[in-house]
Amino acid sequence: MRLPGRHVLYALSAVTMLAACSSNGARGGIASTNMNPTNPPATAETATVSPTPAPQSARTETWINLQVGDCLADLPPADLSRITVTIVDCATAHSAEVYLRAPVAVDAAVVSMANRDCAAGFAPYTGQSVDTSPYSVAYLIDSHQDRTGADLTPSTVICLLQPANGQLLTGSARR
């Protein structure tokens, strides 16, 4: 398959053995205050801001839980004999970066749809066209399909960017 002017290095697809996946949850946050102008508080309230987290160390995660902005030290093999990946801080050398998670139907056109969605999501994340960038595109497909085969959707395509020259990335490609 080809994305406009660029070969897709490879496409990994799979039907996972899990019926659903969970997100990694919230990251950081701000405690809100009551600032209703019609009922001002009796005493001054202040907003508390969580401290900036320290750089994230490497962690192992199942690939179906990858989130936009995750940088991967490694990728699962094409045969999916291993379903975990190592996520690292994007400032360190890494093999790929997740730039899009998008719903996709699992049917005969899944490869075409995944290519279309990954191509469309590239420029908004990187600020570059996939044709003129130093990156190649790959993807993983998590079908979320139940084991009866009765429900083929919703499914998720997880789009990854990698250096076209096969070298490692250092830093995020996010604009």
UniProtKB/Swiss-Prot annotation:
Residues 31-56 are annotated as: Disordered. It is a lipid-anchor. A lipid is attached at residue 21 (S-diacylglycerol cysteine). Residues 1-20 form the signal peptide. One of its GO terms (cellular component) is plasma membrane. It is found in: Cell membrane. Residues 33-48 have a biased composition (Low complexity). Keywords: Cell membrane, Lipoprotein, Membrane, Palmitate, Signal. A lipid is attached at residue 21 (N-palmitoyl cysteine). It comes from the Bacteria. Its main location: membrane. This is Putative lipoprotein LppN. It comes from Mycobacterium bovis (strain ATCC BAA-935 / AF2122/97).
